[in-house]
Design a protein with these regions (language model features):
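Acetyl-CoA-dependent GNAT
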Residues: 1-54, 59-60, 72-74, 78, ...
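C-terminal "cap" of GNAT-fold acetyltransferases
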Residues: 85-88, 92-130
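Surface-exposed beta-strand edges and their flanking turn/coil or helix-capping segments
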Residues: 43-44, 52-56, 66-68, 102, ...
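Conserved glycine-rich acetyl-CoA-binding loop
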Residues: 36, 51, 59-73, 80-82, ...
């Protein structure tokens, strides 16, 4: 979802996270703040040693509280628990604040791996070696 608009690839993953992520060895995490769900992220398994995090969303009313950082750190931890070697992400150039966070956490710019389904809107691909 980019600026509130669903892209062609989004409806299936948003409406069927069980099939899109969980049944394929992935995970979905939610963030609670003041007893409310205010954020989420999906962790998609690309292969035995590789994951991609996707669909990171934080409620605008709770941004700048470190929630995105905590969700990404949870993804990193789960990847390590599953003995993954790399964590990937796709993003657009319209999200410079997110890019700063990704760099701070240890992600770097890379070319897409062959097992990644690159979305039409993707303008930047990043990876963290674990």
């Amino acid at each position: 979802v980019l600026k509130g608009k669903l892209e062609e690839e989004d409806p299936f993953t948003l409406h069927h996270p069980d099939k899109a992520y969980l049944e394929k060895g992935g995970f979905v995490f939610f963030a609670l703040y003041d007893k409310k769900v205010v954020g989420c992220v999906a962790l998609k398994r690309l292969d035995e040693e590789t994951f991609e995090f996707a669909k990171l969303f934080i409620d605008p009313a709770t941004r700048k509280l470190g929630i995105a950082t905590k969700l990404i750190e949870r993804c990193i931890t789960r990847c390590k628990e599953n003995e993954a070697k790399q964590l990937w992400l796709q993003t657009t150039m319209s999200m410079p604040q997110a890019h700063k966070l990704y760099y701070k956490l240890g992600f770097g710019d890379r070319e897409a791996p062959k097992q990644m389904e690159v979305l039409k809107r993707t303008e930047k691909i990043m990876c963290m070696d674990l």
